[in-house]
Amino acid sequence: MQPTPLHAAHDREIESLAEFDKVVSEHGSLARFRVQAVDLTDRTEALLAVDTAGAAFLGCPMDPEAAARVRATGALVFPPIPGLPFDPYRGSLYSPDELFASLDTGYEATPDARAYAWFQQTKADGDVFASMLRAIHDDSVSDALDELLVGTRVVGVMGGHAMARGTEAYEGAARLGRELARAGLTVATGGGPGAMEAANLGAYAAPFDDEMLTEALRLLAEAPSFTPSIGDWARAAFAVRERWPDGGPSVGIPTWFYGHEPPNAFAAHIAKYFANATREDGLLARSNAGVVFLPGAAGTVQEIFDNATPNYYESRGEPTPMVLVNRAHWTEKHPTWPLLQSLARERSMESRIALVDRIEEAPEALKRLGG
């Protein structure tokens, strides 16, 4: 899964120097373009020469003379914000390597941990400027995610963060992710630990022979949980990635709202948000091939009905498949299935929901429901 070619989806956005040079060369104008987080300090000559009326430069370092000139000709310049542990204007999604940079010196030094610390502090302060920066960041992430997923069939895999490595449930979720990826679907999860990591791991393992996943599961079981040490948990994942580089792509969509749950290292593309509501709705809305719900607690129950609501009202168009895994869990422990059935009765979503006993049945159920 590769990002969408230049401007195929958002044809007036510039997100790299190569794109900037291409637009200047081919159009001779930057009028009404949006330039995101591109260092333009070496492009002063172009900025002094071309039309920039109606353009917006979002977090783009540039020479003061160039900044003055583009403002004078009708552009908006949003300067880089010093001292932030993240770029609110970023034009791309995160990678595991970016979020876990400096892991060797301790998880607390990573950009992921530093962004979470900033979020906790500014949220406690009630700083309106920080709130604005979080909103800009999350919108930039959504924009990058939409560009990545154009034309893809996305299946969401939902489940709890408490599912430990080394368990039968974790292995089952990993095999599910692998089968879905091998079927040509893009696996998307909440991007965290537990069932989410397992499904991303399975997608990562898809290009390799079956023994790779078996061995990777064995290695990961040595650090079964992100508690008590996120560092040990993350390093085990990176050791697997180092042994088997160039794994299959998938998407993780975590949040700093639950920042104590770290992102997992097996999702190639990470859309990490500050606002959990934006993250959850975005993940479900983009799962156009359906959603598999593994056993979970309050968070997973909420996600089931977050997805059921637009299916019920058909507010996103035709209902998408919903497959719940583990009959005892969803009819006895957390009896969500009877209510979902009741809502679906005599509506078009009735033919788009299924309950299966075993995780191995989920891919066939998705296919049967039209996913």
Predicted regions and their residues:
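Acidic/glycine-enriched connector segments
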Residues: 25-44, 49-53, 194-290
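Short glycine/serine/threonine-rich phosphate/pyrophosphate-binding segments
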Residues: 166, 195-199, 299-306
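Short, charged/polar "capping" segments at the starts of alpha-helices
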Residues: 63-67, 165, 260, 329-335
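N-terminal active-site beta-alpha-beta segment that forms phosphate/nucleotide-binding
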Residues: 153-157, 168-216
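C-terminal functional extensions of proteins
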Residues: 11, 15, 283-285, 317-371
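N-terminal accessory interaction module
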Residues: 5-130
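Glycine-rich anion-binding loop/nest that anchors nucleotide
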Residues: 57-61, 288-309, 319-329
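ATP/NTP phosphate-donor binding region
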Residues: 66-67, 71-105, 124, 132-148, ...
